[in-house]
Swiss-Prot record:
Function comment: Chaperone required for proper molybdenum cofactor insertion and final assembly of the membrane-bound respiratory nitrate reductase.
Name the UniProt record assigns to this protein: Probable nitrate reductase molybdenum cofactor assembly chaperone NarJ
UniProt keyword Cytoplasm present: yes
Recorded name of the encoding gene: narJ
InterPro entries: DMSO/NO3_reduct_chaperone, NO3_reductase_chaperone_NarJ, TorD-like_sf
Entries under Pfam families matching the protein: Nitrate_red_del
């Protein structure tokens, strides 16, 4: 995956996994045009399929699905360190480590979200050097896989985006790390 494809893929995933409000809908045509440029056919087609699927929902129904899936679902939230430690003290250390990693890479995250919020992590992956993105996602690959599995079990339309993410991570050479594995 070349740099441009990586940046478009991770940026698009960050957007598409964000809250689907009016602003989100207004940006979709621009994202669709950018996604058309992705060289990897599988990733491009799955992202475009998500547009078709999400368009079959009314704006209100899509928001309801999003909120039910990510905001009310403890097992399907997008805070990837939550799978390891929930609200435990150890999570704070992981969050601080992530924030420091971002800053060391020149990425200054917003204070509106915790550093382990998946769309924010995807923004980082789009902006950072590939080695830094790889390092962050290697630690949490099992968490991303677990989230994808849970979304699939819930028949969420967002499962497809997580499968795109897993394919993109594999494409940039992300391999499993024991350190960040989901605890059974």
């Amino acid at each position: 995956m070349n740099t441009t494809d990586r940046q478009i893929t991770f940026s698009a995933l960050s957007c598409l996994l964000s809250y689907p409000d009016e602003e989100w809908r207004a940006e979709l045509p621009d994202w669709k045009a950018l996604i058309q440029e992705i060289g990897n056919r599988q990733i491009r087609e799955k992202l475009l399929h998500f547009f078709e699927t999400s368009a079959s929902y009314s704006p209100e129904a899509l928001i309801e699905h999003y909120v039910y899936t990510f905001d009310f679902g403890k097992k399907t939230n997008m805070y990837v360190t939550y799978f390891n430690s929930g609200e435990q003290r150890e999570r704070g250390i992981e969050l601080l480590h992530l924030k420091n990693t971002y800053e060391q890479s020149g990425f200054l995250p917003t204070e509106k979200e915790l550093p382990d919020y998946l769309p924010l992590m995807l923004e980082f992956a789009a902006a950072a050097e590939i080695e830094a993105a790889r390092s962050v996602f290697e630690k949490y690959l099992s968490n991303v896989r677990e989230l994808a599995s849970r979304l699939e079990k819930n028949d969420s339309i967002y499962a497809e985006l997580l499968h795109v993410l897993l394919a993109a991570l594999e494409n940039i050479g992300v391999r499993e790390s024991v350190e960040g594995a989901v605890q059974a």
